[in-house]
A protein has these predicted regions:
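Secretory targeting and sorting signals
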Residues: 1-10
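Kelch-like beta-propeller repeat domains
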Residues: 11-309
Length: 309
């Protein structure tokens, strides 16, 4: 279902996924929004779809346990919205999603209070499901793409802290939604792979804060949409896990090796079950990347896993 340093080192060839056993967890869901909130030092999850309806609950994870936050007001129930942390304003930005309608509202999460605030902007991207939100190498949150119910988008926007401003790079990736995207903090490069489009985009793009570059990788994952990507400081690489591919959900783990401009599949001693639409984030409290939720076929998941290199 779809709704620092420039030096690099080679990532190891193997790693292990370990399932965590927190005392409580959010209910099962897929196509949730999830990111690390640097202000509160916690991972935040919002919304998703549980097989019967859209969700609008907020949860945080401190490296040990999940906690439900009864926030009011709150964004409306939705799936396939996206979030990213704005280090300038120290707020989490949430945009878009789908709940029977395509959504174009902007919400800010203050994890220190904690509360949500709806921002009534003068300008905004189109109302879309599956936009790609990411911290840009210049320190702002950028948005690319999404699907508005008729067309896949290829516009790019930047959050100023109070409004959206459109960016016009000389080249942009092909239009798409629900791609896996993450920023490599060790290289200052954004990495984007896959997604949904009129023609399945089996390609890798990188962005340095000014220019998008289509990479000619010698090896790469299968085409996936709703895959989960995050930067892992332990590997100094962007990790890509899972995703849907032609109706078959995946559970492979890949890393983008920037110096070689190539993907490498990691041999994992254990792996979460296949899934699409899962949340992923690097959790400094654990010191590892974690994955939560998603769906495997019609099975909706609420398990939490950490990746140990």
């Amino acid at each position: 279902m779809v709704f620092g340093s420039t030096a690099t080192t080679a990532a190891p060839d193997s790693a292990g996924w370990v399932q965590l056993s927190p005392s409580s967890s959010p209910p099962a869901r897929s196509y949730l929004a999830m990111t690390y909130d640097g202000a509160s030092g916690k991972v935040i999850v919002f919304g998703g779809y549980d097989g019967t309806g859209y969700l609008n609950d907020t949860w945080t994870f401190d490296g040990i346990s999940w906690t439900h936050v009864a926030a009011s007001p709150s964004p409306s129930a939705r799936a396939n919205a996206q979030m990213a942390y704005d280090s300038v304003t120290q707020k989490v930005v949430l945009f878009g999603g789908y709940n029977g309608n395509y959504l174009g509202d902007t919400w800010l999460w203050d994890g220190t209070t904690p509360h949500w605030t709806l921002v009534r902007t003068t300008h905004r991207p189109a109302a879309v499901t599956g936009p790609m939100l990411f911290p840009d190498p210049n320190g702002r949150v950028d948005l690319f793409g999404g699907f508005d119910g008729h067309f896949y988008q290829l516009t790019m926007w930047q959050w100023t802290g109070s409004d959206w401003t459109q960016l016009v790079p000389s080249m942009v990736p092909y239009a798409r939604s629900s791609a896996a995207v993450a920023t490599n903090n060790s290289t200052g490069q954004v990495v984007m792979f896959g997604g949904l489009a009129d023609v399945n985009p089996v390609n890798t793009w990188t962005y340095d804060g000014a220019t998008w570059t289509l990479q000619s990788a010698l090896s790469q994952p299968l085409w996936v949409y709703a895959g989960s990507a995050a930067f892992d400081p332990n590997l100094r690489a962007v990790v890509l896990f899972g995703g849907g591919s032609g109706g078959i959900d995946q559970n492979s783990t890949w890393v983008w090796y920037q110096r070689g401009r190539n993907w490498r599949q990691m041999a994992t001693t254990q792996s979460p079950p296949p899934r699409e639409g899962a949340g992923i984030a690097y959790d400094p409290a654990l010191g590892h990347v974690i994955v939560f939720g998603g769906q495997n076929g019609d099975a909706y998941l609420n398990d939490t896993w950490e990746l140990i290199p």
